[in-house]
């Protein structure tokens, strides 16, 4: 029967350290040819857009997709459907808002592990929305962070985020009134916004910083200006195929001949040791995250296996 797993049940199962482990494995397996990822497809109508991401892991014997619809509603519902690739049977349907937030954060955690300085201790957060939770938790999972600065256009939102997350993580956090002040002296910078104009400027960056940019997964979005990207000695993407379609931070520079796709490694290539993530302490490094279905599939497989083991979720009265 098909297991149905709700958001709150996913949250019971999936921790950030486990999500980081799973996403790292997914990216490594794809790079070494043992997993397949298909870039996001979009079907647009006047009222909104249906978005679908597909991936497969022959090693896990799983294939599946994530689907969601973005329209005028402020609420977007994400679902992962996971199939057994040997039997062809639908194994599970998972409510995937929480899962998506965790795996997106985990990708930044993996990038931080391989690209940030090992002694990174100060984290700057640009953005304090729902996705910021995963970004914060992931960096704290891979580095000994002792200070977090948070910027939001609504400073009260930033303060509320600090209050909530400092108690959960046991880390000193405070809201900051400007982006420039937020990133000054930071070792790692997380940018997770829906900005259409650059939020992070190159003039604010300092040697040795690492940046995770996870919000510009559309050609109409920009989180970094051209100067910020050009100051980075190493710019990595999760998927070149996907970034070519939708990376709003990089496409303008590519179009002007200021960047070359062939010079931008994928994070999986760094994980596999084919390319260094950082060559010295003074380099500024950047990870551009678009999101990949293979991250969803690896994470979903773990969630489903754990749910069955612990009798979490319900079996739908359909299928064999």
Predicted regions mapped to residue ranges:
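Rossmann-like adenosine-cofactor binding region
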Residues: 170-255
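NAD(P)-binding Rossmann-fold cofactor-contacting core
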Residues: 141-168
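Glycine-rich Rossmann-fold phosphate-binding loop(s) that bind the pyrophosphate
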Residues: 128-129
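N-terminal Rossmann-fold NAD(P) dinucleotide-binding loop
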Residues: 132-133
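Short helix-loop-beta connector
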Residues: 115-122, 144, 206-207
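Adenosine-phosphate binding glycine-rich loop
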Residues: 9, 221-320
């Amino acid at each position: 029967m098909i297991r149905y797993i709700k958001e709150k049940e996913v949250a019971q199962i999936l921790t950030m350290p486990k999500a980081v482990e799973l996403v790292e494995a997914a990216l490594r397996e794809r790079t070494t040819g043992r997993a397949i990822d298909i870039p996001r497809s979009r079907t647009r109508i006047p009222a909104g857009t249906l978005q679908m991401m597909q991936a497969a892991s022959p090693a896990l014997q799983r294939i599946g997709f994530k689907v969601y619809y973005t329209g005028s509603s402020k609420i977007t519902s994400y679902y992962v459907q996971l199939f057994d690739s040997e039997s062809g049977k639908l194994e599970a349907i998972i409510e995937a808002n929480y899962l998506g937030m965790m795996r997106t954060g985990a990708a930044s955690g993996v990038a931080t592990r391989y690209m940030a300085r090992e002694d990174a201790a100060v984290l700057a957060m640009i953005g304090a929305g729902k996705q910021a939770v995963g970004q914060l938790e992931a960096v704290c999972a891979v580095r000994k962070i002792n200070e977090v600065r948070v910027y939001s256009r609504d400073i009260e939102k930033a303060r509320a985020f600090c209050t909530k997350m400092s108690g959960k993580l046991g880390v000193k956090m405070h809201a900051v009134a400007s982006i420039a002040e937020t990133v000054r002296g930071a070792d790692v910078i997380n940018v997770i916004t829906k900005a259409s104009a650059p939020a992070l400027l190159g003039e604010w960056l300092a040697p040795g910083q690492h940046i995770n940019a996870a919000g510009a997964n559309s050609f109409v979005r920009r989180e970094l200006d051209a100067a910020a990207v050009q100051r980075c000695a190493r710019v990595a993407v999760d998927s070149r195929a996907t970034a070519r379609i939708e990376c709003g931070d990089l496409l303008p520079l590519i179009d002007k001949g200021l960047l070359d796709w062939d010079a931008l490694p994928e994070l999986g290539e760094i994980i596999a040791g084919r390319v260094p993530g950082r060559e010295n302490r003074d380099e500024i490094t950047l990870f551009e995250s678009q999101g990949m279905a293979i991250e969803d599939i690896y994470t979903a497989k773990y969630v489903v296996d754990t749910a069955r083991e612990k009798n979490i979720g319900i079996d739908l009265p359909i299928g064999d």
